[in-house]
Regions:
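Internal hydrophobic alpha-helix adjacent to the cofactor/substrate pocket in enzyme cavities
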Residues: 354, 360, 556, 560-562, ...
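A conserved FAD-binding loop/helix module that cradles the flavin
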Residues: 554, 579-580, 699-722
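Hydrophobic Val/Ile/Leu positions in short beta-strands of Rossmann-like dinucleotide-binding domains
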Residues: 416, 439, 544-545, 568
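Glycine-rich FAD pyrophosphate-binding loop
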Residues: 435-451, 565-576
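Flavin-dependent oxidoreductase catalytic cores
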Residues: 1-417, 421, 425-437, 509-510, ...
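Residue-level detector of alpha-helix initiation sites
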Residues: 177, 327, 420-422, 445, ...
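Rossmann-like NAD(P)H-binding beta-loop-alpha module
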Residues: 419-432, 538-564
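A Rossmann-like FAD-binding core segment of flavoenzymes
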Residues: 464-510, 517-540, 560-686
């Protein structure tokens, strides 16, 4: 397929960009030193995407409100964000190095500036005695019991001035333009939107005024030709997400409608904005601005970017429109441009999983793209838990400064047992380093546990990743990598024959033994998925034991694809504990019957999933599951609310009395156990005991059951070391 539109040059203002591919603002957090100066890690991270052929890169979040919004800084005035505000020459030196690196590859780079976090900032400052701030009195997103109080007009004007100073600093450092983050419910969105700005007096009771003042201040300081992109939600889509209920529970003001969003963009264009990165949603429905694997491709690009583009054409507005939202398939991105929905496409996660996406597409090597799987564990969850952006399927993302594939000084014979994502990463990396590698896989396809997960419709991103993974590994096989399919290995096959053995043979499912299991039909979740979710014909009601992400994905898919009644039972206080907010909230939203993967109302569940948390299965009888459920268990369905990371103390989160339970009987025809697994480490310990090779390693689930992220990361570390 030809990609004429993708690789056409285009302008934003007077800034000419070599193609229509823009890197979304992902990165930065914890990629700077404690005073906010960009580190080598950040420079190499963006440099790699420039090398890969991206036309325009946009940095991640850079707040300008230090000393005003307490959520953007930490103790002793340190920060996990980079900084460009004020007049520090020390900070500016790092930014100059970054722009020089990007420009070396004929890419452009804009800096993303934001007013701050406001109500979506960490509650920790309040727990240390500081006063949290927002546009009006608003609840903290993480701990709703904590209030944010309104900024004064004077404080807001100070933020406006800081935008101007930060932008001119960026211009001096070589940035080609600025992007303003007025989306997702961050402070700039709070000051310009009805749900959060309910000011009745003063300059900023006008919802558009703050954004207009910021744009004019930047143009005044940097000149009219210095281009500005405004990142905007055409609507917060809260009513679309939850109906009227959320307004009673969380907000006092109504959302921005699409009609108001169009008017807002017109006002911003007249103020001087050159392009709009247009999206929908906010933190309270984070699955829209950060769409997980569960959404189909471009679920709302036509509705949002296409609507704005059509409006601009009608009004004679010359600003460019940038489309965003699951555009990782090259043919989909080209189609969006070809149909005129947008002037540019913005890629975030696709460029984290494969920085060379543009180059591969331009050279007709689409099958070699390392596709994003939409789990968002590396790109988002990592920095929420204190790390920096990285990627599940690309172990070099965020580590470009320190992880290199270097030729081994001594060639070794390497055996790898298991062709899951970890085993494949180990095989690929060791082979590229010059080792003689044999990969043993017991099935006829590579992919491991991900293959079972890809059997359900909402995991089509994983299916695409596995398809390309097998293609890429077969290319290496043609070059000499020995891959042996349908080959189950015993210790006798390995002892004394290899210099290095890497056990990547996964896990064994765990099914708890519960009284009465012989009285009810049951199966383990992974076995059920491998059977293509084949249910006995008489089954109308299914109970899933285990409300982790696998259990909830399976429960939803049973109702969505098989139209059966499903109940989930989970021992912990919440469903999907530890899962990134956007993915968790979307799956809850789907399970509640409030939305669909296609975005179409007709695809919403007819039978929403019933769920019991803080509940334990005590016995089975024929067609019945008996559980003890805590009487004060939480409502399992609050997708607009995230779970506070366990390292942040929440004084309002009270523990339940484990003895305060009621017995509930669930009618069911079939039980599926989604209760995790245990490491398949028998072979590993046998090999160690026999001293089967000089070097023996266990990686991924064969060491500790976990996510694909841990498996691929540990595989890469070992393979670069041997």
């Amino acid at each position: 397929m030809e990609y004429k539109k993708l690789f056409e040059p285009e302008n934003i203002g007077k800034c000419k960009i070599k193609n229509r591919i823009i890197m979304a603002p992902m990165g930065n957090i914890n990629m700077a030193d404690p005073i906010g100066r960009p580190s080598l890690k950040m420079i190499e991270y963006f440099g790699e995407r420039a090398k890969g052929g991206t036309g325009l890169l946009i940095t991640g979040l850079i707040p300008v409100s230090y000393g005003i919004d307490p959520t953007v800084s930490e103790d002793n005035d340190t920060t996990y964000f980079p900084r460009i505000d004020g007049s520090s020459r020390t900070r500016l030196s790092g930014w100059r190095d970054l722009t020089a690196k990007v420009h070396s590859f004929d890419s452009k780079i804009f800096i993303q500036l934001t007013a701050g976090l406001g109500r979506v900032g960490s509650p920790e400052p309040a727990l240390k005695g500081k006063i949290l701030k927002s546009a009006s009195i608003n609840k903290n997103f993480y701990v709703p019991q904590l209030p944010h109080f309104p900024f004064t007009d004077r404080q807001i004007k100070k933020i406006v001035k800081s935008f101007g100073q930060s932008a001119v600093n960026a211009k001096v450092c070589g940035f080609d333009g600025v992007q303003l983050h007025g989306h997702e419910g961050y402070l700039m969105d709070q000051l310009t939107s009805n749900p959060w700005n309910r000011r009745r007096f003063g300059r900023y009771s006008n919802k558009f005024q703050f954004a207009v003042d910021v744009v004019r201040e930047i143009k005044k300081r940097c000149g009219e030709d210095f281009p500005i992109i405004y990142r905007v939600d055409l609507t917060q889509a809260l009513k679309e997400s939850y109906g009227d209920e959320i307004f009673r529970k969380r907000f006092k003001g109504m959302e921005r409608t699409i009609e108001e969003g169009l008017e807002f963009c017109k006002v911003l264009y007249n103020a001087g904005v050159d392009a709009f990165d247009v999206d929908k949603g906010c933190y309270d429905n984070w699955f829209f601005p950060h769409p997980p694997a569960y959404f189909e491709d471009i679920p709302y690009v036509k509705e949002i970017a296409g609507t704005l583009k059509e409006y601009f054409k009608k009004e004679g507005i010359k600003a460019k429109v940038i489309a965003v939202g699951k555009l990782g398939k090259p043919e989909v991105a080209e189609d969006v441009l070809d149909k005129g929905y947008a002037d540019f496409v913005m890629l975030g996660r696709p460029l984290l999983s494969d920085p060379y996406w543009p180059q591969k597409v331009s050279e007709g090597r689409e099958k070699e793209i390392n596709h994003c799987i939409g789990d968002q564990e590396g790109c988002i969850q990592s920095f929420i838990l204190g790390g920096h952006p990285c990627c599940t399927v690309n172990p070099y993302t965020g580590f470009e400064d320190c992880k290199k594939v270097e030729k081994a000084s001594v060639k070794k014979k390497v055996a790898i047992i298991g062709g899951g994502p970890g085993g494949c990463e180990a095989a690929k990396t060791a082979f590229l380093r010059g080792h003689e590698v044999t990969l043993f896989e017991k099935d006829n396809m590579l992919g491991g546990q991900l293959i079972a997960g890809s059997k359900i419709k909402i995991k089509h991103d994983v299916e695409r990743y596995i398809k390309n993974l097998n293609y890429q590994m077969n290319l290496l096989k043609e070059k000499g990598l020995d891959i042996r399919y349908n080959c189950e290995v015993k210790k006798e096959d390995l002892i004394g024959k290899y210099d290095v053995i890497i056990c990547a043979n996964g896990l064994s499912p765990f099914v708890p033994q519960i009284d009465g299991m012989d009285k009810i039909r049951h199966i383990e979740a992974r076995e059920f998925l491998k059977s293509d979710m084949s249910l006995p014909k008489d089954v109308k009601k299914v109970t899933v034991i285990g409300g982790g992400v696998v259990g909830c994905e399976l429960a939803y898919s049973l109702s969505y694809e098989k139209n059966v009644d499903v109940t989930v039972v989970e021992m912990l206080p919440n469903l999907m504990t530890g899962v990134v907010h956007s993915n968790r909230s979307m799956l809850l939203w789907l399970m509640m019957g409030l939305g669909s993967p296609t975005g179409k109302k007709e695809d919403v569940l007819k039978n929403p999933i019933k769920a019991y948390t803080s509940s334990k299965v005590i016995k089975f009888e024929e067609n019945k599951v008996y559980i003890n459920a805590n009487r004060k268990r939480k409502d399992p369905y609050t997708p607009w609310h995230t779970l506070v990371p366990e390292n942040i103390h929440n004084p309002f989160d009270k523990k339940l009395n484990p003895n305060d339970v009621e017995e509930i009987i669930i009618d069911t025809d079939y039980v599926i156990f989604s209760t995790g697994g245990k490491a398949s480490d028998t072979l590993y310990y046998e090999l160690l005991k026999e001293k089967a090779a000089k070097e023996i390693y266990a990686i991924g689930d064969a060491k500790t059951p976990g996510r694909a992220w841990e498996a691929i990361t540990s595989a890469n570390e070992v393979a670069r070391f041997i």
